Amino acid sequence: MNVKLFDSELKIMNVLWKEGDTTAKHISDVLKEETGWNMNTTYTLIKRCIKKGAIERSEPNFMCHALIAREEVQAAEAGELLDKIFDGAVDKMFAALIGGKKLSKDEIKNLKELVNKLK
């Protein structure tokens, strides 16, 4: 992914990823409730996402469609964090993420499956 999204733009994208294609008005309503943003703020951020190629706009009703998948953004953000904070060391990043947390049996099983796929 070559599109860098800021936290405010990710809020817009999260609404689209959660709800699917929807109107700018609906995104504005959701984010007014969640963040207190007014309609102008939300529309400005939607337009910024459109310019970046993250959202496609269509008429009628200023319909918005996500052009970037959540997983693509997650992978790019995780990769950036890995490089910036952990000098590319996956094991150090993983240890920091897990910390002293207790993992469920399902989480452990899923992690083992991921590691086995890498072998």
State where each predicted segment sits.
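Short acidic, hydrophobic short linear motifs in intrinsically disordered regions
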Residues: 22-30
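Short helix-coil junctions and helix-kink-helix linkers
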Residues: 29-37
